[in-house]
């Protein structure tokens, strides 16, 4: 789960009907992945990703979320409206979704949905 609600490299605004495809990475995704490379110029600017349609066709989906920085978006993903601007929100409609989240990632949900 990305800070903006993306899953895979399906960024906000991605069509829910998309299948596996090549995407141009957003600057925020490039910055988030630069820690894996010697310099930011080495980070790929494109990637292949499963489309949201493919993800929703999976028998089971496991969403792992950690850190306080993901708390607000996790609340939107699980309790907000299903919306292409929060791509992972479509997972609310999956028949077999398991979410594994640490205490920090759950903090907003615990505060808002007791």
PLM feature segments, named:
Residues 1-114:
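Conserved phosphate- and dinucleotide-binding cores of soluble alpha/beta proteins
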